[in-house]
Amino acid sequence: MVLTSDHLDKKNIRKIEYKGEDSFSNSMSKLPLQGGMSDSIFMASISDFSNWSRLSSLWPLLYGTSCCFIEFASLIGSRFDFDRYGLVPRSSPRQADLIVTAGTITMKMAPSLIRLYEQMPEPKYVIAMGACTITGGMFSTDSYSTVRGVDKLIPVDIYLPGCPPKPEAIMDAVTKLRKKIARNRFVNRASRPIRTKYFSISHQLNLVPGTCAGKYNWDRENCGTKLAPANFSENCQKFANEHDELKSAI
């Protein structure tokens, strides 16, 4: 996006093609030229300049709740070095524009996740990492405390399946997110609607009788006959009378 002396060469003017605002490219050879311009200025629209600066400096908020976060932690090392993508992990949601949810989301953690997402400034992006985050994973069938998909709580931009995803797949997801940010338009970007908080929704629970609860219910209803027989009170009174007679005789 920076003009250099090579672009101002008259021989290269015919080779340069103009690229509209609907698409974005980091290449410096796709910009229109005007005579007499300096080689130290930017030639870009507001949308392209905003997207270029944002995709080059994503600040993620790491939200790891399970084993998938171990794979993301390996990106910090020298082997993958995610600093070359401009990723700077932040501990405060007010300083982050990307949240990476890695692991199982439980019912108790759902309000905290939504609160963190709402504290992030716009524009903000979400990467759902791992099968447990996307669909609930192995807990999606018979778990009473697992949220079956983080997209039921917050909007998701990139889905990254796997159990767990490899670090290479995580970098590919970051690359795809950068391409998505590059295609956004600043003037037409609509703010996401304010949704009802998760912890304020009244759940509609349907009680279903269990198939193996018959014996338990029968034992519960008849436990009085086993522990307290019908003549239990009479035996207690008889024992008390015998104790009083024995005490008076002594």
Curated annotation (Swiss-Prot):
**Main location, first listed in the record:** plastid
Name the InterPro entries on file. Answer: NADH_UbQ_OxRdtase-like_20kDa, NADH_UQ_OxRdtase_20Kd_su
Respond yes or no to whether keyword Translocase is given for this record: yes
Question: What name does the UniProt record give this protein?
Answer: NAD(P)H-quinone oxidoreductase subunit K, chloroplastic
Q: PROSITE patterns attached here?
A: COMPLEX1_20K
Is Transmembrane helix a UniProt keyword of this protein?
A: no
Give the matching SUPFAM superfamilies: HydA/Nqo6-like (SSF56770)
Its function? NDH shuttles electrons from NAD(P)H:plastoquinone, via FMN and iron-sulfur (Fe-S) centers, to quinones in the photosynthetic chain and possibly in a chloroplast respiratory chain. The immediate electron acceptor for the enzyme in this species is believed to be plastoquinone. Couples the redox reaction to proton translocation, and thus conserves the redox energy in a proton gradient.
Q: Which reaction does it catalyse?
A: a plastoquinone + NADH + (n+1) H(+)(in) = a plastoquinol + NAD(+) + n H(+)(out); a plastoquinone + NADPH + (n+1) H(+)(in) = a plastoquinol + NADP(+) + n H(+)(out)
Q: Which family does it belong to?
A: Belongs to the complex I 20 kDa subunit family.
Which key words tag this protein in UniProt?
A: 4Fe-4S, Chloroplast, Iron, Iron-sulfur, Membrane, Metal-binding, NAD, NADP, Plastid, Plastoquinone, Quinone, Thylakoid, Translocase, Transport
